[in-house]
Amino acid sequence: MSEREFLRFGDELDVKNCNTSRSFNGLLMAIGGIIGGTAGMLIALIIAGFMNFMSYWFSDKIVLSMYGAREIPYEEAPWLHQIVEELARRANMPKPKIYLVPMEQPNAFATGRGPGHAAVAVTRGILEILDQEELKGVLAHELAHIKNRDVLVATIAATIAGAIGFLANMAQWALFFGGLNRNEEEEGGGFAEMIGAILMIIIVPIIATIVQLAISRSREYFADETGAKICGCPVALARALKKIEEYVMQVPANVNPGTAHLFIENPLKGGGIMELLSTHPSTEKRIQRLCELARKMGQECI
């Protein structure tokens, strides 16, 4: 990919990020309208505004605290900080903070609202199974997400998914207490609203999945390519993805499904319907693309 193509694709991603965020907010308001009419839409609008505000300013703290991550001081792992510093220099971006997640499953993610306010988190497991070249590939992939501002959109998606779940709970309580604006004179309308609320409660998990899938798989492909160019070794990233996938299938992780799309490899991977609805492209396809890039760079693939 030429520099001009790289910049043009980056501009396209900025537009896509904006459109995706608007779509999430619109989806939330539509669900609020179905559940509670005008009042429901107003509540959904307030929730969306609050969630977006929280996502923008506190997304890194929310996600990191969710997984008990702690910041790694330079003195504890100078080699790791040096790797991130070098990669950030190559990517022409500020060095993000580095966090350790006390999780045995090998994985990593990035969070934050932009290059100047971001963090990269690695699990204990990934530090144990990858060599330094492979780890460079993983960290470069996460820096690519930060540079492309994928992290902000992904975090907004996670918070909107949570808000959708909140609205579903509202519908359940409304049904329980008969608070769906029914009265004796409008039994037909009240019945229709009740059926609509029941259907909404049933399909909310499906909608939450669609929200996650809206985080385009092309973002992962582009982050792989950009990360491989940053670290200079597509083969190392390909090896890392292969190792991580093998361990993810064997080592379970206590991960909130609403944040699964933040990780470099789907931490809930398990085949079947979950594989079909995965927020990530298949590892095999990602490796194939990295191998193609490696050959263009004169490297032998795995």
UniProtKB/Swiss-Prot annotation:
GO terms for biological process: proteolysis. The keyword Membrane applies. It is a multi-pass membrane protein. The chain crosses the membrane at residues 27-47, 151-171, 195-215. The active site is at 142. The keyword Cell inner membrane applies. InterPro entries: HtpX_protease, Pept_M48_protease_HtpX, Peptidase_M48. Its cofactor is Zn(2+). Binds 1 zinc ion per subunit. Its main location: membrane. Pfam families: Peptidase_M48 (PF01435). Its EC number is 3.4.24.-. Zn(2+) binds at residues 141, 145, 220. GO terms for molecular function: metalloendopeptidase activity; zinc ion binding. One of its GO terms (cellular component) is plasma membrane. Keywords: Cell inner membrane, Cell membrane, Hydrolase, Membrane, Metal-binding, Metalloprotease, Protease, Transmembrane, Transmembrane helix, Zinc. It is found in: Cell inner membrane. PANTHER family: PROTEASE HTPX. Belongs to the peptidase M48B family. This is Protease HtpX homolog. It comes from Aquifex aeolicus (strain VF5). The lineage of its organism: Bacteria, Pseudomonadati, Aquificota, Aquificia, Aquificales.
